[in-house]
Each structure stands twice: as C-alpha cells, then as structure tokens.
C-alpha cells in the first residue's frame, strides 16, 4: 500500500510543527 503525495506532505507538515513546538517548549524550560 504505497503512500500518496498528500499523506507524505501531511506527515512532513505534522513533524515540522511538532518539532517547532517541542523546540519552543524546550527553550522556555531551559530559561
């Protein structure tokens, strides 16, 4: 079952948002 372009794009977008949120949360906790 191959992934469609939409599913791949959605997965990358979600991973990007999650990374940004975790990075901001980490910097706030570090301060």
UniProtKB/Swiss-Prot annotation:
<dbReference type="Pfam" id="PF07465">
    <property type="entry name" value="PsaM"/>
</dbReference>
<feature type="transmembrane region" description="Helical">
    <location>
        <begin position="10"/>
        <end position="27"/>
    </location>
</feature>
<comment type="similarity">
    <text>Belongs to the PsaM family.</text>
</comment>
<dbReference type="GO" id="GO:0009522">
    <property type="term" value="C:photosystem I"/>
</dbReference>
<keyword id="KW-0602">Photosynthesis</keyword>
<dbReference type="GO" id="GO:0009535">
    <property type="term" value="C:chloroplast thylakoid membrane"/>
</dbReference>
<keyword id="KW-1133">Transmembrane helix</keyword>
<keyword id="KW-0603">Photosystem I</keyword>
<dbReference type="InterPro" id="IPR010010">
    <property type="entry name" value="PSI_PsaM"/>
</dbReference>
<dbReference type="InterPro" id="IPR037279">
    <property type="entry name" value="PSI_PsaM_sf"/>
</dbReference>
<keyword id="KW-0150">Chloroplast</keyword>
<dbReference type="GO" id="GO:0015979">
    <property type="term" value="P:photosynthesis"/>
</dbReference>
<keyword id="KW-0793">Thylakoid</keyword>
<keyword id="KW-0812">Transmembrane</keyword>
<keyword id="KW-0472">Membrane</keyword>
<protein>
    <recommendedName>
        <fullName>Photosystem I reaction center subunit XII</fullName>
    </recommendedName>
</protein>
<keyword id="KW-0934">Plastid</keyword>
